[in-house]
Amino acid sequence: MPRSLKKGPFVDVKLMEKVKKALESGDKKPIKTWSRRSTIIPEFIGLTFAVHNGRKFIPVYVTENMIGHKLGEFAPTRTFKGHAGSEEKKKAKGK
């Protein structure tokens, strides 16, 4: 169930302060954040966020299409290495 419209989108207070500071100064450095749950709002367009994925910070450049999504959606937390299999199966699949 989506968030109520009367409440508005959730944005972490500390993150919003960092965004306002960056917009006032015109700074283009990535804004470091652990707040993956924050919703992307129109004020974020054109800014770069360094979103923490649990291990490192992933740079996310915000565009118009991202509005309404969460910052965490663009910084995957899991890596898929592939399933182990024998070489024979891989060769047979290729034929």
Curated annotation (Swiss-Prot):
InterPro entries: Ribosomal_uS19, Ribosomal_uS19_bac-type, Ribosomal_uS19_CS, Ribosomal_uS19_SF. Keywords: Ribonucleoprotein, Ribosomal protein, RNA-binding, rRNA-binding. One of its GO terms (cellular component) is cytoplasm. GO terms for biological process: ribosomal small subunit assembly; translation. PROSITE patterns: RIBOSOMAL_S19. GO terms for molecular function: rRNA binding; structural constituent of ribosome. Belongs to the universal ribosomal protein uS19 family. Protein S19 forms a complex with S13 that binds strongly to the 16S ribosomal RNA. This is Small ribosomal subunit protein uS19. The lineage of its organism: Bacteria, Pseudomonadati, Nitrospirota, Thermodesulfovibrionia, Thermodesulfovibrionales.
